[in-house]
Design a protein with these regions (language model features):
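Residue-level hotspots within the lipid-embedded alpha helices of multi-pass solute transporters
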Residues: 14-18, 115, 151-158
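Juxtamembrane transmembrane-helix termini in multi-pass membrane transport proteins
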Residues: 2-71, 127-146, 169
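Hydrophobic alpha-helical transmembrane segments in multi-pass integral membrane proteins
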Residues: 57, 117-123, 187-188
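Interfacial loop-to-transmembrane junctions
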Residues: 163-184
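Single conserved hydrophobic/aromatic residue that forms the stacking wall/gate
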Residues: 186, 193-194
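Membrane helix-loop-helix hairpins that form the core translocation module of multi-pass transporters
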Residues: 38-110, 164-167, 171
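Hydrophobic alpha-helical transmembrane segments of multi-pass membrane transport proteins
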Residues: 144-165
Length: 194
């Protein structure tokens, strides 16, 4: 990845994705408010651990497919671009369904599991990261490099949400804490239905 402008564009896209509300951020906030900062940070670290796994698997799969069918990269570019547009429009006009889904496990495992079972994470890694690959000779290494950038940006976002939510809501009433839990379960139901 020698082209700084491509890396810069990727970082901007990733920052906009990492700091926008989603399942992991909702879980980080919920755990931070309900159980404290430590649990929110554990979710963030669990999610980052899941992202390492997703990075390695998706990079390996994409590299294998690319070596078999080099032209597939064009289709992945198109699909990735369409996915970015779809997510942008879906975010603008989203409404929330009401289904109650709970994860009964420790915070680290909750973050890890939620990241691994979230199909949107897999789609992002499989379709968006290849858009920013500039050299097909180093395809695998560039995907892993982009995955590492993604993991660090997501981790910074998740830690920021954990620290801020635990600080601002530490003295909140039980009513506010229940509202945050309900909001999380609604978001989770909405995200897994899409």
């Amino acid at each position: 990845m020698s082209d700084f402008s491509i890396v810069f564009e990727f970082v901007l896209v990733q920052i906009s994705v990492a700091f926008s509300p989603g399942l992991i951020i909702a879980l980080v906030i919920n755990e931070s408010v309900q159980k404290g900062r430590k649990n929110g940070l554990q979710v963030a670290i669990g999610a980052a651990s899941g992202a390492v796994f997703i990075t390695l698997i998706s990079s390996g799969v994409l590299n294998f497919v690319f070596n078999l069918i080099p032209e597939i990269l064009t289709l992945i570019y198109i699909f990735g671009t369409l996915y970015i547009f779809y997510k942008g429009f879906a975010t603008l006009k989203s409404d929330v369904n009401s289904k109650s889904i709970k994860i009964k496990t420790n915070s680290f495992n909750a973050g890890l599991k939620l990241n691994l079972i979230n199909p949107k994470m897999w789609v992002f890694y499989l379709s968006v990261l290849p858009i920013f690959v500039t050299d097909s000779n180093n395809f695998l290494l560039q995907l892993i490099y982009l995955g590492i950038i993604t993991i660090f940006i997501n981790l910074i976002a998740d830690i920021s949400y954990a620290l801020l939510s635990s600080y601002f809501f530490k003295d909140s009433s039980n009513k506010i804490k229940k509202l945050i839990t309900v909001s999380y379960t609604h978001l989770r139901a909405h995200e897994t239905v899409d």
